[in-house]
Amino acid sequence: MDNSNSRDPHSFGAPPIIASPAKRIEAFTGDPNFMTSLARGLAVIHAFQERKRHLTIAQISHRTEIPRAAVRRCLHTLMKLGYVTTDGRTYSLLPKVLTLGHAYLSSTPMALTAQPILDRLSEQLHEACSVATLEGDEVLYIARSATPLRLISVDLSVGSRLPAYCTSMGRILLAALDDAALQEYFERADLQIKTSRTLHTREKLLPCLEQIRQQGWCVVDQELEVGLRSLAVPVLDASGQVMAAMNVGTHASRITRQELERRFLPLLLKGSQELSSKLFH
């Protein structure tokens, strides 16, 4: 894996936030075709994050700088349409929100090309296989072939997001960043302890990422959740740069780390190379 500084540091990093959602919406004042109510509704949806799944009206208003009355109307509309629910005080998103991005993610060239490859890998390995890209500080699942057995508490599907620092695909993608982009990531990322095994400091993660650069693959062993062991490899673009990651997730009680490397790694590398070849040749 090439970690030269010639890569565009913004290829995988989050774009800088230059204004609050409310300020960005205000910039379109005077445009007769701009729907402020729709823009506010989308801003309310984006206010929810993995670490803040339950928010009050006041919290959403603070995050977006949209007036509370407008936030309340947006939430009421989203509830009526089945995108949001409430316990009387806080609000949270419902799974229907995933449909907003699922159609796009599932129809991208990479997703369409990756799906049959993942299906074949999943059938060969009898484990769930996925492809993801880096979106801000998280990995975004764009294709997945699941198995009936759920591996973690979150039901993963196309559009799901997980923290990059403690997932195998995330570390593949972080290892592909140049030094400047990686520095920016560590300055803003919220590195939480998920299990007793989680590498959650820059000092521990940097040597790990350097090893990934050298060997070209990554195993994460029960750092996101106890029992989850996963292996990931890079998916390269036409110039040989990392554009995505492909992984297989297993339960630690079924598959040893040695078996992941011995039996699963060759098949996963072959799958990622096939995906790159079909996309760019």
Task: Please state what every model-predicted region is.
Residues D2-L112, Q273, S277-H281:
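N-terminal helix-turn-helix
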Residues D2-R24, L151-L224:
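Short, solvent-exposed recognition segments
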Residues F34-L38, L94, S107, A111, ...:
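Short, structured helix-loop boundary elements
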Residues T90-R188:
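Amphipathic alpha-helical effector-binding/dimerization core
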Residues R229-V233:
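Short hydrophobic beta-strand micro-motif common in sensory/regulatory domains
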Residues V235-A238:
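Sensor-regulatory modules in signal-transduction proteins
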Residues A244-H281:
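Juxtadomain coupling helices with adjacent low-complexity linkers
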